[in-house]
Every structure is written in structure tokens, then in C-alpha cells.
Amino acid sequence: MNVKLFDSELKIMNVLWKEGDTTAKHISDVLKEETGWNMNTTYTLIKRCIKKGAIERSEPNFMCHALIAREEVQAAEAGELLDKIFDGAVDKMFAALIGGKKLSKDEIKNLKELVNKLK
């Protein structure tokens, strides 16, 4: 992914990823409730996402469609964090993420499956 999204733009994208294609008005309503943003703020951020190629706009009703998948953004953000904070060391990043947390049996099983796929 070559599109860098800021936290405010990710809020817009999260609404689209959660709800699917929807109107700018609906995104504005959701984010007014969640963040207190007014309609102008939300529309400005939607337009910024459109310019970046993250959202496609269509008429009628200023319909918005996500052009970037959540997983693509997650992978790019995780990769950036890995490089910036952990000098590319996956094991150090993983240890920091897990910390002293207790993992469920399902989480452990899923992690083992991921590691086995890498072998």
C-alpha cells in the first residue's frame, strides 16, 4: 500500500469497513456520535481520502466506497511500526505485543498455525 492514512482518515475508513458502501451523510452521522466531529470536518476528511485514492465517490447521494482493504492498511501500518520501532525484528515486536498477557487456547492455536505456515 502506498497510501498513508492519518488517524482521522482511518476513522472514516473504519466506518466504511464496518458498514460497507454508504453515504457521506451516514459517515458524518456516525462520526458525530463517536467523535463529536461536525459535518464539514467529516466531508473534508472524506475528500482527502478520495484524493489519496482510498475512497471512491459516486452519485447519487455522495456514496462512498472503500478502495483499500482493512487488511492492506493493517499490514502496511504493522510493517511501518516493525521497521520504525523494532528495527525489523518480528520476534521483538511479537514479544512486545504479547507482553504479560494471558492468551486463550484459540489464540495460541491460531498463532501456532501462523508460525507453521511460515516454515
What are these language model-derived features?
Residues T22-V30:
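Short acidic, hydrophobic short linear motifs in intrinsically disordered regions
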Residues I12, I46-I50:
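Basic amphipathic alpha-helical segments that dock to polyanions
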Residues V3-S8, P60-G79:
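Short, cationic-aromatic polyanion-contact patches
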Residues I50-E59:
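A short, conserved structural fragment
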Residues A76-K119:
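Amphipathic alpha-helical dimerization/coiled-coil segments
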Residues D29-W37:
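Short helix-coil junctions and helix-kink-helix linkers
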Residues L16-G20:
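Short helix-to-turn junction characteristic of helix-turn-helix DNA-binding domains
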Residues L10-N14, H26:
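Pre-recognition alpha-helix immediately N-terminal to the DNA-recognition helix
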